[in-house]
Amino acid sequence: SLANKIKKKFKKIDLILAPAMGGVIIGYEIGKLLKKETIFCERVNGKFTLRRGFNIKKGARVLIIEDVITTGKSSLECVKLIKKSNAKLVGFACLIDRTSKTKLKNEIISQVKLKIPTYNKKNLPSYIKEIPVTKPGSRFLKWLN
């Protein structure tokens, strides 16, 4: 299981940080299995923020858990919160790792690694040029704000 992989890789974790919305449930459940406190961050005016009385203690060893990591952008925003709190990032974990090129410097522990190609709009293969473009994810959904 993902919890067992995390336990083997990261010996010292004080806190789990999960970005809303997708990371909340997986972060909570992994935290329960590992007996670790879990908090989440949520977007306020487009930026991840700790709310609801959550905080990261100075020096805490923090694991970021998400449902899916594709570009790593949400994870990098979480890293900023950890640094701002003078805490330490121990690593990243997710159910599905879709990364190919990412700015995440730490190893990603995942249950599944998927290699799904992404294309620049100028270099689309002919067989997908006629398919309408959609952008999944919750980053810009207005109903969340």
Where are these regions (language model features)?
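Conserved acidic residues
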Residues: 14, 60, 90
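PRPP-dependent phosphoribosyltransferase catalytic core
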Residues: 79-145
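Short, glycine/charge-rich flexible loops or terminal/linker lids adjacent to PRPP-binding catalytic cores
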Residues: 26-63, 71-73, 126
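Short, well-ordered alpha-helices that flank and scaffold nucleotide-derived cofactor binding pockets
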Residues: 4, 28, 32, 80, ...
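Active-site-facing substrate-recognition patch
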Residues: 1-12, 140-145
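Acidic, divalent-metal-coordinating active-site segment for phosphoryl/phosphodiester hydrolysis
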Residues: 68-79
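Short glycine-rich phosphate-binding loop at a beta-alpha junction
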Residues: 11-20
